UniProtKB/Swiss-Prot annotation:
Its main location: secreted. InterPro entries: PhiA_domain (IPR052820). Cell wall protein involved in development of asexual structures such as phialide and conidium development, and thus required for spore formation. Plays a role as a general stress protectant produced by the fungus in competition with antagonistic bacteria. Keywords: Allergen, Cell wall, Glycoprotein, Secreted, Signal, Sporulation. The gene is phiA. One of its GO terms (biological process) is sporulation resulting in formation of a cellular spore. This is Cell wall protein phiA. One of its GO terms (cellular component) is extracellular region. Glycans are attached at residue 60. Belongs to the phiA family.
Length: 185
């Protein structure tokens, strides 16, 4: 009897623990950068010019709510998308080749992914962080309008000649009222 009670208690504890670590309950989410002591800390992710940024003041996107400064994302079958109510998706790709060095970008509609790039491999981990192929992301300062450019970890600490890049946790935050946007190419 004691063993049965112990097993039931352990099972309940494991279930409660797993529930606390699950991915967002909503399909749509925003992302903020986490790196304590850095200017990128708590900066929201946005999309512009076929790239992903943190802390960009203006996305110059065509949105239902144009004053919002962050992008809305969703994952489907391991692929990451920018949310739009239209039937024309904008899908994220990653180029981890020697040329791409972890470049994260997006294509629109039927555009093919660039050579050497990957679309699948996105997931939200038990800490509620977005990762690509099980790795956290990288943020590099001094991009357009003072924003941070966002890169996948391809084993290059400062990709594409950037300097002072930092590893970040890309924290996922539920969005209950997604902002439909078409982002600039």
């Amino acid at each position: 009897m004691q063993i049965k009670s112990f097993v039931l208690a352990a099972s309940a504890a494991a279930t409660a623990s797993a529930a606390a670590c699950q991915a967002p309950t909503n399909k749509y989410f925003g992302i903020v950068a986490i790196h304590s002591g850095s200017a990128v800390q708590y900066q929201p992710f946005s999309a512009a010019k076929s790239s992903i940024f943190a802390g960009l003041n203006s996305q110059n996107a065509s949105c239902d709510r144009p004053d919002e400064k962050s992008a809305t994302f969703y994952i489907q079958d391991g692929s990451l998308y920018l949310y739009a109510a239209s039937a024309t998706p904008q899908e994220i790709f990653v180029d981890r080749s020697g040329m791409g060095q972890g470049k994260i970008g997006y294509t629109t509609g039927a555009q093919p992914a660039p050579r050497n790039s990957e679309r699948q491999g996105w997931a939200i981990d038990s800490q509620n962080h977005l990762q690509f192929q099980g790795k956290d992301l990288i943020a590099c300062p001094n991009s357009i309008d003072g924003a941070w450019s966002i890169w996948a970890d391809a084993g290059v600490a400062n990709p594409a000649g950037n300097t002072d890049c930092v590893g970040i946790a890309a924290r996922v935050e539920d969005v209950t009222n997604p902002n439909s946007c078409v982002y600039t190419q």
